[in-house]
Amino acid sequence: IVYLDECHSLLESHTPFLDNFNGNIVGLTGTPPKRKGSEKYRMVQKYCPVKYEFSVDEATDNKILNDYKIIVHKLELSGVRNLPKKKKDGTYWYSSEKKDYEYVTKRFLEAVKPKDRQFTSIMRMRSIMEYRSKESYVKSLIANMNSKCIVFANTQAQADRICSHSYHSTNNNSNRNLELFSDGRIDKLSCVLQLSEGVTIPGLKSGIIMHAYGNERKTSQRIGRLLRLNPVETAVCHILCYNNTVDKAWVSQALKSFDKSKIKYYNPLIRQYELEI
């Protein structure tokens, strides 16, 4: 028997080995590929199609994984004109997050051709990912945390700004920082994508996801980093969401497979929990 852990990462380059293997193939994944026609979808369908499903909530109910709760923080876009925008001549002018969001959304809504819709959608997402108000909120959030916490940032520069210790491909101290975080000598670490899967951090009880992307797979993988505790413990995942923006739809999409009773929505303006996003 061959066990393919994280089988959603299968590539066509693995075909020669799999074709020549005469035994049973068992694939294991928490996020099977869903995009039909993609390389990874084809590989999973060919060599280890889904035969049995066991959800995260079934695993927590059966004490295989520790329990969890998700707190969605409903943030407002900033109206302060401190967002630098570059002109064609290389100089800068300043807008606010609110004004910039109105502009990129207007461009998206006015786009007619599919390629233009796709382009303006990506540009809107990139704009939202660069807004600094989430960074300020994260810093205030982790300042009040006494346990080990990982922050999933949007960019390498953002990860470096948020925590004193970061983990990403251009940081030469990444492996050292991960070691310090794993053994408990530091309790805060920011990263981008590389800790989304395949890395287990002992005693990791808290995580912050700055941007959900509307991607259920990425969100599941990141929350999965918090499900390695003793089954009697509970992990907390914080997800930041800009209120009254497309960010709400992205977060809802990313969390659609999770137990709704374990999700709470916090409004920091009134310091109260609300019923829905």
Predicted region positions:
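Loop/turn-to-beta-strand initiation segments
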Residues: I1, N22-V26, K148, R185-K188
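Walker B catalytic acidic pair
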Residues: D5-E6
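Post-DEXD/H (motif II) to motif III coupling segment of the RecA-like Helicase ATP-binding lobe
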Residues: S9-I70
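Catalytic P-loop NTPase motifs of RecA-like helicase/translocase cores
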Residues: S9-L11, K34-R35, G198, E216, ...
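Interdomain linker/hinge connecting the two RecA-like lobes of the SF2 helicase core
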Residues: V50-C149, A153-A157
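A conserved SF2-helicase RecA2
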Residues: F54-N66, R217-I223, R228-I277
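Conserved helicase ATPase core of P-loop NTP-dependent helicases/translocases
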Residues: K148-A153, A157-V199, K218-T219
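A short beta-strand element within the Helicase C-terminal
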Residues: K188-V192, S196-Y213, K218-Q221, T234-L240
